[in-house]
């Protein structure tokens, strides 16, 4: 499975567009400000990484369900809820190529 932020696949020709696919990852560990800003920042970074990994796994699963070889035009959006949960959503276009 090729995952790319570009709209094309260099060296390949896109032969079929199967639609938009997405993946969402949520880190349910609430991030709270502690006495150490360094620890808080590390917790935020770890939470974002966990949510991003989960979102990419979900994106790839959804793309595999469509029997495609690639997802192009990927866009990653990272948000924090009012409760300081990290949410990562990823969207792209599922394609087959030759």
Language model regions located:
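Short, solvent-exposed loop/turn elements at beta->coil junctions and helix N-caps
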Residues: 6-9, 75-81
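Short, well-ordered alpha-helical segments
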Residues: 19-75
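N-terminal presequence-like segments and the immediate start of the first folded domain
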Residues: 1-31, 64-65, 69, 88-98
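A generic structural micro-feature
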Residues: 84-86
């Amino acid at each position: 499975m090729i995952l790319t932020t570009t709209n094309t696949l260099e060296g390949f020709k896109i032969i079929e567009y199967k639609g938009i696919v997405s993946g969402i990852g949520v880190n349910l560990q609430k991030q709270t400000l502690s006495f150490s800003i360094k620890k808080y920042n590390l917790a935020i970074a770890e939470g974002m990484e966990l949510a991003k990994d989960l979102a990419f796994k979900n994106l790839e699963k959804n793309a595999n369900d469509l029997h495609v070889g690639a997802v192009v035009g990927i866009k990653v959006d990272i948000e924090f809820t009012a409760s300081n949960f990290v949410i990562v959503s990823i969207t792209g276009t599922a394609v087959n190529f030759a």
